[in-house]
């Protein structure tokens, strides 16, 4: 008699963020959380297609308000967070970002059933290296992005949440037109694939502990 091993139950996944999570200008299948789930399954990690709460242009405060409005009562096996570029773009302070990011981390952990080890944060891409930023002070943008990312990283360390630094990958995309969508600002599937590849081993470690 052949024994059939039942499939492992899917691990629910919630992705929180802004244009970089929704994949502005790219196909839905190219969104980095969707690619992460697709990469995880053949590795024996049955990650479900993600629920996504994200919109182009959102700051930390706007994401938090949208989460409240969504009134999502589910608990997830994995929650991702990538947010902050619009805080920097609008000239908001790092101190305000830190405060609001800390609150979002708490929200993400709540969605993960209070388990910090089921939350992963991705760093803010450096839009100063995009075609959209031509004529702007790229060095100043890079400095500010680094400051925002340092604040996020420190908050993750305090909360014992995993932090994945994808910013170098976005900087390396400079000058490669195939890495950007038609608006010259957002990223195509190949760039977001790199984020998913970089995040996969972190998620594997977290969910197999």
Could you say what each language-model-derived stretch is?
Residues 24-29, 91-95, 140:
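Short, solvent-exposed loop/turn segments at secondary-structure boundaries
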Residues 22-24, 61, 87-91, 128-133:
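A short acidic, helix-capping loop that chelates divalent metal ions and anchors anionic groups
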Residues 60-99:
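Oxyanion-hole/transition-state-stabilizing segment in secreted/luminal serine hydrolases
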Residues 126-209:
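Catalytic His-Asp segment of secreted/periplasmic serine-dependent ester chemistry enzymes
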Residues 1-56, 66-73:
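Serine-esterase "nucleophile elbow" of acetyl-processing enzymes
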